[in-house]
Design a protein with these regions (language model features):
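Conserved functional micro-motifs across diverse proteins
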Residues: 8-226
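Hydrophobic, Leu/Ile/Phe/Ala-enriched alpha-helical segments that form helix-helix packing faces
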Residues: 1-2, 64
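Sec/Tat signal peptide C-region and signal peptidase I cleavage site
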Residues: 3-7
Length: 226
C-alpha cells in the first residue's frame, strides 16, 4: 500500500500557556497540559489505497488519581473552508474505518474474481481452422471449437486458489491496519496511550480537532491551506 504524507502547521494564540510543541521524527507535535491530562497531537495529510485523509496521531497521559475512559467516538473535527464556512468532517472510528476498508477490498476481490472468471471461463476451449476449395477455386474456411474438460477444471481450480490467496493477503492487511488505531480504552492513573485516527479529507484553511476527555475538550487548530 502506498502512502503519501504532507505535514501541517499548528495555529497558536500568543497567550495560550497550556501548549508545548516539539518535533518528533520530523512531525510537529502540540501538547496541551490541563485538568490533569496531557494530550498531544500531530496531524498531516495521507493518501493510501483506500482514500485521502487527515491523519491524527494522539497521545494521552492521565495524571489524575482516578481512571478515565477515552472514547474515540467523541472526537470531532471541523474545517474552515476557503469560502469561510465551517464544515463538519467525518472522523472515522476504528469500526467505521475497517468497514470502509472491507468495502474497498470486497470491490477489489469482486473485480479480481470477474477477470479471473473470464480467463477461467475461456479455458478448455481451443479453435481450429480448415480451408477447402470448391471446383471453381472458391475457398471455404471451417471453424471448429474444441473443449477440454480437464483444462477447464484446472483453470477453475487456479482461479479459486487466486481468490483464496488474495483473500488471505487482505485479511493480513486488515490486521496490520488495526494496529494502533484508537479504540475505546480505560486510561489508568499515570498511564498513557498513543494511537491514531483518520479524518475524511476536504480542502480548506483551518482544521480544528476536538478531543473530549473527562468532561474537558482539548482543541487543536492546524493550517491546512498549503
Amino acid at each position: 500500500i502506498s502512502i503519501i504524507s504532507k505535514a501541517q502547521t499548528l495555529i497558536l494564540s500568543e497567550n495560550d500557556s497550556t501548549v508545548m510543541t516539539e518535533y518528533n521524527d520530523g512531525n510537529l507535535w502540540a501538547y496541551r497540559n490541563a485538568n490533569g491530562f496531557i494530550v498531544g497531537l500531530t496531524t498531516y495529510e495521507t493518501k493510501d489505497d483506500y482514500g485521502k485523509y487527515y491523519r491524527i496521531d494522539v497521545f494521552i497521559k492521565n495524571q489524575c488519581d482516578s481512571s478515565v475512559i477515552f472514547t474515540p467516538d467523541d472526537v470531532t473535527s471541523h474545517l474552515l473552508t476557503n469560502r469561510g464556512d465551517n464544515y463538519q468532517l467525518m472522523v472515522y472510528t476504528n469500526e467505521a474505518f475497517q468497514k470502509k476498508i472491507r468495502k474497498s477490498q470486497n470491490w477489489a476481490m469482486a473485480l479480481y474474481g470477474f477477470s479471473s472468471g473470464l480467463s477461467a471461463g475461456s479455458a478448455g476451449y481451443s479453435t481450429s481452422y480448415s480451408t477447402s476449395y470448391s471446383s471453381n477455386g472458391t475457398a471455404y474456411t471451417t471453424v471448429t471449437n474444441h473443449y477440454d474438460a480437464n483444462a477447464a477444471f484446472q483453470a477453475n481450480m487456479a482461479s479459486s486458489y487466486q481468490l483464496q490467496t488474495l483473500g488471505k493477503m487482505m485479511d493480513n492487511d486488515r490486521e496490520i491496519k488495526r494496529q494502533g488505531y484508537l479504540k475505546k480504552t480505560t486510561v489508568h492513573p499515570n498511564e498513557g496511550i498513543i494511537g491514531y485516527m483518520n479524518i475524511k479529507r476536504k480542502k480548506g484553511k483551518i482544521l480544528t480537532i476536538n478531543i473530549p476527555i473527562n468532561g474537558y475538550v482539548y482543541s487543536f487548530d492546524w493550517d491546512v491551506s498549503k
